[in-house]
């Protein structure tokens, strides 16, 4: 195997394309136009990617990878990263030596402009000489002394021949002077001064020497080393290993005949054919004018050398600009690279349920816009809050590397696990349960944020109650996913109607019982089945009737309707949950027209925000969130309070701002005092302790105070504000200080364990215990009451007691830290064991159920669930609407989460989503992303579809039209820019 062409799995990382998947292929080093390049070929075919190596290598690393195998990692100057794995160690080492030589020549390029090509020729030639006869190797070994002597002299004639024509003939001459094999050449090129001096000649002299020495070399050396071959082709080191000696001799004979006759058929066809071949214009390629070299035959490539100076239309023009930094600027990728830009999420250990749900939520463009584009103050939100972790992952998912993305995924999982412990391990979980938990937690975080802004000051604005009261941020869950259903209970005796309203984030619908003669039922049938009228036992307060009828209608529609299809049934005899594999048709459109009234409110338009509803912000917020928050929940649990008001006031020299800060502190003290009086009457002493101070400040006023007195007052009030917080429990505090924004700084934050706050709690132990302060104060008071002398003995006793307390606290701290470390290690070990056990069980159950993964085609088993019956006209209208969406209140399919497996307790989740920006469907299977047709989604997921996302047709059309206009505008701007340039 040629050391300059190695094979193995390849992965490439660049700023433009991200990180690609491991693909089988090869690295091939070629030299062309005195530039060394790396050509990446994939076994699956396609356009090879070409990376310039000359003056472009940043780092080369070789690591072991299995028995007698290695992984070669190459980093370029633009931070592009290339890896090839499972390469034989010998070949990988030779490739590394060559790349190191290229890298070292880059360092000396300023003083030795021609050193690069010269040393490359010496290296490549010496490598070639290893494949010569043993006579040459023994001859080289016997010339050690002469080699050293030649290196000490300044006679550079042999090396000029190397520069002129780095063929085997020239290397043989160099071997006569003692040049060692390939593995020792890199050190010589970097340390030998005579070698460097021998390389100092300009390109014109080299070309003349190459042309003049051709006939001499033909007479002195074997035919396969004939220097009359293409100079340009023979400077390419990799081509010397493409064919055997026999093939080389045949090709050279043919070239000799062509040159003698004056005809160049191979040259013309290969050269001009290569111009029409596909070129690699990918952003990661630095040589845009390189052709597909591997597609040419050796004879065709060698025949190029007979042209004195080949001049394709763009080679010489682009060659001068190869080092121009503008080539590395991000460009709009072609359609062939769209799939490389899309990256999935790594499976952290049975977390396919989380990956599928997150991909579906992130694909909702209106949901993402409401989360990211309303100016939410992320620095005010704790680091471990789900909404902050969620938004951070949404922003970084398409631009960060896989390791960073995996870390962000862990933080999202930890944020949810902190509230719902069932998601903390690595066991399999239900995707619908995760979706419900995620949406509820996002709602709570937004409510906490809005409550925080009611009491937090707004820097730069006047301190008026109206401004703080009207600052409301839009909850993306409420505006996009939440809807309201009105249940009307109608007494069948007197007709009394009792309305009740309920908010939902999604609907869990039953599978309709399929009748054998009829075709399969659809999602539309299941939805209509949910809203059918039903009878129930109900005691009427007006007439005493015991029977009533319940009707369900939409009171407010969502932008996106989420439908959860109940694909499970409970087997009473076996006490097992079974998955139902019944076929259910997935329509492109479904309609809610039969479940709406004339009073039904349409979805929020895309321009709506909570700030527009400032006339009644509190009522609206309480109404839509009434189903989530219990009234008994203390308000202090909803405040993400960042105590920065003091810092804000001290940073300004304005007296008005100081007054405003003091007034704010007063209001906070009053609020905290009133809460304490209402909760516990026995704590009146604390509030009374604050009241005299407030009255004194109020009576004294601020007009007559100097700036220093105002600062002192602010500091005093701030200290009193902070004193009650010492008695609060740790869970009332935010898990971490929200002092960084997710978009810029979170990616650089120190490693942390967001799922617990144990790492932060020891910090509070170092502070003096409040109990110790109480005891010390009590002793001091007793000394005062008993009139203890204030001599040195009292001071010594006090200091001894304080030292004893501090020593005891330090011991407790050390014990707590040791215990915490032990518990952490035990928890990590248990977590690893759980992961291994869960993975084994998951694989075992999945393999057992894979044969039956298509499920059964029987009835749903829900005997009380009847099939919907339509008239012939209604059925025809619904069938037509499923393709066109012409009926009012129609919704368009945009995502499907599917469960693969025959049982409800094990399996695998995948997600199909419609990308509005690319106007195409994609399948996300953990880390793998593939393009799929909508018809395939509808047909392939009819037995496994579990959760369905439908977007209101008008909202969908508006988003699609906006995206098309944006793309058209970008194209027009691009054309104008190119015309101007």
Curated annotation (Swiss-Prot):
Compositionally biased tracts (Low complexity): 183-200
Question: In what residue span(s) does the UIM domain sit?
Answer: 706-725, 808-827, 830-849
Spell out the PROSITE patterns in the cross-references: UIM (PS50330), USP_1 (PS00972), USP_2 (PS00973), USP_3 (PS50235)
The protein's UniProt keywords, in alphabetical order, are: Cell cycle, Cell division, Chromosome, Hydrolase, Mitosis, Nucleus, Phosphoprotein, Protease, Repeat, Thiol protease, Ubl conjugation, Ubl conjugation pathway
Query: The USP domain covers which part of the protein?
Result: 343-953
GO MF annotations in UniProt: cysteine-type deubiquitinase activity; cysteine-type endopeptidase activity; protein kinase binding
Q: Which reaction does it catalyse?
A: Thiol-dependent hydrolysis of ester, thioester, amide, peptide and isopeptide bonds formed by the C-terminal Gly of ubiquitin (a 76-residue protein attached to proteins as an intracellular targeting signal)
Kindly provide the name given to this protein in its UniProt entry. Answer: Ubiquitin carboxyl-terminal hydrolase 37
